[in-house]
């Protein structure tokens, strides 16, 4: 409990923006990037150096009750501070709308048990006054849409992606993100979608992230989709916290297809490759991160948000609702040193950002591991082969080639001398 209190205080301090701001802003740069962090706030400088352009910040920042603490009285102080801070660091925001305000919850949810949160105890039921909630969403989106009307003073990076709550199927301590039925969440999703589009027709609505593909999780979401959810979001959203290098993508794509939503782009807004029950070294996790990101991009993921950028000073235990991560899977360790995962992330970004086409040569999944991966990524006017597994590369790779490993180290090698391992390499023909 003490650790949770310290962690809550850390979040509160960071929400208030009590840190130095560097100067930079180019609103278009990185908007189409595939790479982000949750949250980049823990280390903006290294998040950018690792190739990230997107932040999925603390949920409390865009919570109804944070911004409208009393009905009809808006206070954007903390949210504005965050938006100014994140845009000065050159990051775009995926904002997570939390549809909870204490004054509203008291109207019809006094029977619900209070849930611990960084902002105190609260209930997390469906809004009692849905029209008041929609009015809040309209005001929120209008403030950050960048249309010049009622915008935040100094807004440079408009917010164009709005996520509707988080893992609503998670309803048992120590992780309770929602207290309600699939129908309740569907009604929130529909109301939010309508309000977002009314305020900004160009904005995109992101489904609240699915916590995973366990049967009980899928059961909740199937009921949401049965009510017509696919009509009320633009981007599908999956999480994978230690679920394997496949990041739940094959089963999630199957689920979307079965629910007539296969045409929806999808993001993985929580990625963590550390397995709490099978600890590995940072070097092994770096290879795992590279395999999972390459696999995800090759299989259609549009954006990836890595969770364990850097550990906060005080992290609650797993029993207290903490994530159970360690320094083994951070990009920046507790001493501020860059880890092998940092370089693996950066190398994937440098090699594959802005690719326009990908072809699979070979792919093999076994349990949680992508045992083999061979792909052709087309970027600019060249082909980048990304390879791992066993044996030699495809015979179509001939002569001398440039080989880059996941640390970013480059060598010129004869193609017939290359032997694949479980650590991906990027192979490019040498331009004459």
Task: Write out the residue ranges for each language-model feature.
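Bacterial N-terminal signal peptides that target proteins for export
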Residues: 1-9
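Bacterial N-terminal signal peptides
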Residues: 9-19
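N-terminal substrate-binding region of glycoside hydrolase catalytic domains
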Residues: 26-159, 163, 169, 173-175
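Conserved, mostly hydrophobic/aromatic
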Residues: 86, 140, 162, 192, ...
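Active-site cleft segment of glycoside hydrolase catalytic domains centered on the general acid/base Glu
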Residues: 108-233, 240-254, 271, 275-291, ...
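Aromatic- and carboxylate-lined catalytic core of secreted/periplasmic carbohydrate-active enzymes
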Residues: 293-393, 425-426
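Beta-strand-rich binding/interaction modules
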Residues: 392-412
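C-terminal beta-strand-rich structural cap/linker in extracellular carbohydrate-active enzymes
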Residues: 412-432
